[in-house]
Amino acid sequence: MASLGVNIDHIANIREARRTVEPDPVPMAMLAELGGADGITVHLREDRRHIQDRDVELLRQTVRSRLNLEMAATAEMVAIALRVKPDMVTLVPEHRQEVTTEGGLDVVAQLSELTGMVSQLQTSGIPVSLFVDPVASQLRGCTDSGARWVELHTGRYAEGSWNDQPHELARLTEGTATARAMGLRVNAGHGLTYQNVEPVAAIPGMEELNIGHTIVARAVVVGLQQAVREMKALIQNPRRDPLFGQALG
């Protein structure tokens, strides 16, 4: 059964839209945990467009589940992670003009650089996950880097047409199996919603789904705790086949 990591970046987005102090993502993380979140995920971007350094520092002190820090593969971010010591670091690609992360890391092209960073972090007791597309060559690169986890990019599945989704779901299923055969542990995320999460949650070997925007959007209507409860229920009892998205049973 997959667990749920709640990404609270979009709470910080609301705050930063007015350059004010509310809503504060730190107490919101507590509400997410009360709603059943198995972990809290934040992305500290180089441009600090939403999550700020003080958020990460305070979340490290207050999160009672797991704190997953998403970050670019830079010396600055590695230094922050080594100081804060989150429960996991997920290295992600980052571009200044993007609205959100647009694809997976090119681990093959960046293997030497990533290997050094993975070693630094894991030597300090911080497990590292690499955010990648479900492609065998990239998964092999993850293994070569020394990383113990991958997070599969679900964007093509989540944003695909009705006709494309079964194919993209099959890629995620095959990618999960391939990664596990290589000794990697598997998370997934990007663009998952209440409407499309169940087939991904049902993939054998899937350990955690990191989900943010849809939960925060739902929270506007029902509150954050209830929004998390509803997503957790879908993940714990997925009702659709992981290959074809059809109802189970």
Swiss-Prot record:
Listed pathway(s): Cofactor biosynthesis; pyridoxine 5'-phosphate biosynthesis; pyridoxine 5'-phosphate from D-erythrose 4-phosphate: step 5/5
Catalyzed reactions: 3-amino-2-oxopropyl phosphate + 1-deoxy-D-xylulose 5-phosphate = pyridoxine 5'-phosphate + phosphate + 2 H2O + H(+)
One GO term (biological process): pyridoxine biosynthetic process
Site-annotated residues for Transition state stabilizer: E151
Active-site feature positions: H43, E70, H190
Entry binding sites for 3-amino-2-oxopropyl phosphate: N7, R18, G191, G212, H213
EC number(s) recorded for this UniProt protein: 2.6.99.2
Positions with a binding annotation for 1-deoxy-D-xylulose 5-phosphate: D9, H10, R45, H50, T100
Compartments, as annotated in UniProt: Cytoplasm
Record-stated family: Belongs to the PNP synthase family.
Protein name: Pyridoxine 5'-phosphate synthase
Species annotation: Synechococcus sp. (strain CC9902)
Upper lineage: Bacteria, Bacillati, Cyanobacteriota, Cyanophyceae, Synechococcales
